[in-house]
Amino acid sequence: MNPYAYAATHGPRAGDRVRLGDSGLTIRVESDAQQYGDEFLAGFGKTARDGLHLKAAAVRDTCDVVISNVVVIDAAQGIRKVSIGIREGRICSIGRAGNPDTLAGVDVVVGTGTSIVSGEGLIATAGAVDTHVHLLSPRIMEASLASGVTTVIGQEFGPVWGVGVNSPWALRHAFSAFDAWPVNIGFLGRGSSSDPAPLVEALAEGGASGFKVHEDMGAHTRALDTALRVAEEHDVQVALHSDGLNECLSVEDTLRVLDGRTIHAFHIEGCGGGHVPNVLKMAGVPNVIGSSTNPTLPFGRDAVAEHYGMIVSVHDLKPDLPGDAAMARDRIRAGTMGAEDVLHDLGAIGITSSDAQGMGRAGETVRRTFAMAGKMKAEFGAPEDHDNARVLRYLAKLTINPALAHGLAHEVGSIEVGKLADIVLWRPEFFGAKPQLVLKSGFPAYGVVGDPNAATDTCEPLVLGPQFGAHGATPAEISVAFVAQAALDQGNDRMPTRRRRVAVRGTRGIGPADLRLNSRTGAVDVDQRTGLVTLDGDPIRSEPADSVSLNRLYFL
């Protein structure tokens, strides 16, 4: 077979290159687990049959589901073509699929009772982890799932002024509400309190998995130190939206309060909130895990104009008041927006998130992250004839790094044996924009569906929508609730959710050095007069894009 016919049938081989949508990014397949000439393939007259590449054995001795011959892009695995075996919702094996009785070198034993997801020609990534979601509407989950997000760390439980949920009563109902959605969920408690009692209550009695300290509710010395002390005691993360007015603390003061303790600094560029004008200084600090929210990604020509109205709306400002108008404008800085993209490319900012309905868009984090990668390639070039390193660096910002920051990485964030089979399948031409299928614990949960009255499932109109994993009792059975260990130790669990409870862990004493492929630290400075950003004395800037990829070609 010529290479093009082979790729169309069995997927790309080692050394083949694949373009990712219209992002301008290209990956090169590093290895292929198939045995050429004896490939595993399902279909009429193909090799996935009893006596050939299917082993006649009980499912418990093989796997429940196999994703065959898919190109995996993963911070842990690299970029390789493999098959993925799934048993009881977890990844049980990765490598060559088939029947060890008839094929040498089999890693994924496929039985006559195994369901097959044909991955030939598709790309697999771990489900994205969005750690910054304001849950002001349940419909956010539609946008998140349709973009490839399978884990959400949220705040609020509807259109209320929350910025963290502490009430055990409210958390109980919020967890129950999520039983309708096939996503893993964790809630941040409000950390803006001078007394630890409501924080401990949120963890132990409510099941919160961390804290959010927010300037709108108080990000002063006592509140920040209290949240950090409770977090250190209970091994949970603290997310910080720092004091933008510098009323109580400057960025230098905040770093002194941290005193080396780990924190996750939200929207570290500053337009989403934080110390004006130089919160970006926190990006290079060894104990600060910085993240960006998607409204400023990538830096575009309309970014400055767009954000004024969003800031006014989200923070309940009164633009007729000169002080309120000035506060909004002070947060919008073209220099830091342009530098943000470059700091991501250098690995100095390790996470991207949505800030959904708190200025961000729930369904755009994945595509804006890869649009930013494409913009950086267009502006600064690529060292090789492929973009593997850049693609893996940006994918890590969406998957393993947010999982590491919030203590979820023992369950989600990468395609590794033992982890939940939260896997997103993409057609290469739609990569980053629209998934083909979202598997939640290996079960089809969301994806492309055709006309329900058609003769085949591929008849148009094709739309993204819920699969069987999003119906009935299944969403809760295939998803988990992330909680503090204190909630499990309490022993009087009143949460009625049917989800398995999983304790977060490993959130303290970590920093950028512990993130995958995004470990750059250094002295980041912002000139308060000109807005120029430097990293270790070198100017950091990029130009605003006139257009961005993964956008109008795919969405009206």
From Swiss-Prot:
**Binding positions for substrate per the UniProt entry:** H214
What residues does Ni(2+) 1 bind to?
H132, H134, K212, D355
Pfam families according to UniProt:
Amidohydro_1, Urease_alpha
**Record GO cellular component, one term:** cytoplasm
> What are the subcellular locations of this protein?
Cytoplasm
Urease domain location is 127-556
Q: What class of enzyme is it?
A: hydrolase
What residues make up the catalytic site?
H315 (proton donor)
Which cofactor is essential here? Answer: Ni cation
Question: Coding gene?
Answer: ureC1
Provide the residue positions that the database annotates as binding Ni(2+) 2: K212, H241, H267
Q: Sorted alphabetically, which keywords does the UniProt record give?
A: Cytoplasm, Hydrolase, Metal-binding, Nickel
Q: So, what pathway does this thing act in?
A: Nitrogen metabolism; urea degradation; CO(2) and NH(3) from urea (urease route): step 1/1
Organism annotation: Streptomyces avermitilis (strain ATCC 31267 / DSM 46492 / JCM 5070 / NBRC 14893 / NCIMB 12804 / NRRL 8165 / MA-4680)
Cofactor binding note from Swiss-Prot or TrEMBL: Binds 2 nickel ions per subunit.
The protein's name: Urease subunit alpha 1
Q: Which reaction does it catalyse?
A: urea + 2 H2O + H(+) = hydrogencarbonate + 2 NH4(+)
Q: What EC number(s) are associated with this protein in UniProt?
A: 3.5.1.5
* The UniProt record lists the keyword Metal-binding: yes
State the oligomer form and interacting partners.
May form a heterohexamer of 3 UreC (alpha) and 3 UreAB (gamma/beta) subunits. May also form a heterotrimer of UreA (gamma), UreB (beta) and UreC (alpha) subunits. Three heterotrimers associate to form the active enzyme.
- Modified residue N6-carboxylysine is at which positions? K212
The primary location reported for this protein is cytoplasm
- Provide any one GO MF term from the record: nickel cation binding
The cross-references to SUPFAM superfamilies, in alphabetical order and at most eight, read: Composite domain of metallo-dependent hydrolases, Metallo-dependent hydrolases
Q: Say which family it is in.
A: Belongs to the metallo-dependent hydrolases superfamily. Urease alpha subunit family.
What about PTM?
Answer: Carboxylation allows a single lysine to coordinate two nickel ions.
Q: Which domain of life is it from?
A: Bacteria
